[in-house]
Amino acid sequence: AAVGAGTGAIIGKRMDKVKAEAAQVKNAQVETVKDTNGLDAVKVSFDSAILFATNKAELSQSAKNSLAQFSKVLNNNADLDIAIIGHTDNTGNDGINQPLSVSRAQSVNSYLLSCGVKSAQIKRIEGQGSTNPVADNSTAEGRKLNRRVEVYMYASQKTIQQAQQAN
């Protein structure tokens, strides 16, 4: 169902607040994106250089510190849905990169759950391997940027319904 402009504006304002809160997290890059309903959502990217060693899915201590801080943002916004997407650079083949990207997303998920984030809030955990680069894989810097985990925070059906009623 289409969501009206008034509802979109209410959710947009809410996401601006969430974005500002998430921007305080160490090592997080934050931006506003559109969700599948065309509503504002917040994408938080964590650089895998901070999160993981090359070819590994175990979280580093600095990653745990950042994710513990980020879990507070998620807990403060428990009515939002979450998707966790892992990515790799194009070094190696899909047989390695695809499962590695899934393992990285699962590592982030497990740690967020251990920090008190509710499992019901997390709607999707997936890996996209090297299929969705954000930088040039032919440079070391580009590959570093492509090794990442993204966490999307978006309006749940309940949040949309509340915004529609408030409108």
Residue map of PLM features:
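Short, low-complexity, glycine-enriched hydrophobic/amphipathic alpha-helices that associate
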Residues: 1-20
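Extracytoplasmic/secreted proteins, especially bacterial periplasmic and envelope-associated proteins
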Residues: 2, 17, 62-69, 95-99, ...
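Amphipathic, membrane-active segments
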Residues: 14-43
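Envelope-exposed proteins and targeting segments
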Residues: 26, 38-42, 46-48, 55, ...
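Solvent-exposed coil/turn segments that connect beta secondary-structure elements
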Residues: 27, 33-35, 47-49, 55-57, ...
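N-terminal post-signal-peptidase region of extra-cytosolic proteins
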Residues: 28-29, 69, 108, 136
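Periplasmic peptidoglycan-binding/anchoring modules of Gram-negative envelope and division proteins
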Residues: 51-85, 113, 144, 151, ...
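Periplasmic OmpA-like peptidoglycan-binding domain that tethers envelope proteins to the cell wall
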Residues: 87-162
